[in-house]
Regions:
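A structural signal for multi-pass alpha-helical bundles of membrane permease subunits
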Residues: 1-230
């Protein structure tokens, strides 16, 4: 009752922040990992090495990864702003700015898309070569093969990655806990971090359980809707 009555504004704030993050991170990660998978699906020399390089970040502990990105995006002495200064470009507040923290976290999320890339790569290798050759015979180029063969044949793979991306997006926690602590001004107060604060910082276990159930229902409904209209 306390959650939906509006007496706790952080509930709706955390929900909105998480929805915005999911809406930005899922399409970005899907497009980026699909593009990388396409590059690695070509007959490029040393593609096994590049596949390993792109997948390795997924096995790095998130806490260690967060520490590295905090140094890179430090607004005072971070690598990113030093590069911008060297190029005579305006610097950014990155994780310290209300308007820039979510886009920065979306960019950081691309670091962990190696598993999505591997799944896309496996799906691309299952696309029948005969269909691609038939498009070439009919005079079709790269875009014709991509739009009329590759993407339609990979619909189940894309669907799986979208569903998993949404689920993982709503469960984001470590980045907020380690890198921003929900700040600045609660602009990165993600839903699961809000749940954590309710349970372990404020001791409101009843509220935390209700928040967890709402998260379960949101993910279940979104998954059902995607199944329905996919």
């Amino acid at each position: 009752k306390n959650l939906f009555s509006g007496s706790d504004p952080y509930f709706y704030k955390s929900l909105l922040v998480t929805v915005i993050y999911v809406a930005l991170s899922v399409p970005t990660a899907i497009i980026f990992s699909f593009f990388i998978a396409m590059l690695l699906n070509t007959n490029v020399k040393g593609k096994g090495f590049f596949r390993t390089i792109f997948y390795l970040p997924t096995v790095v502990p998130i806490v260690a990864m967060a520490a590295i990105w905090m140094w890179i995006f430090n607004p005072d002495m971070g690598l990113a702003n030093n590069i911008l200064k060297a190029m005579h470009l305006p610097v950014s507040t990155w994780l310290s700015g209300e308007s820039s923290v979510i886009p920065t976290l979306v960019f950081i999320n691309l670091w962990t898309t190696g598993s999505t890339m591997v799944i896309f790569l496996a799906g691309m290798q299952d696309v029948p070569r005969q269909l691609l050759e038939a498009v070439e015979i009919d005079g079709g180029g790269f875009w014709a093969k991509l739009l009329h063969v590759t993407i339609p044949m990979m619909t189940p793979t894309i669907f799986y990655n979208v569903v998993m991306g949404i689920i993982n997006g709503f469960q984001i926690f470590t980045q907020s806990y380690v890198m921003t602590q929900g700040g600045p001004n609660n602009s990165s107060l993600f839903y699961v971090y809000y749940l954590y604060r309710e349970a372990f910082e404020f001791g409101r276990m009843g509220n935390a359980c209700a928040v967890a159930w709402v998260l379960f229902l949101i993910i279940m409904v979104l998954t059902a809707v995607i199944f329905k209209f996919s």
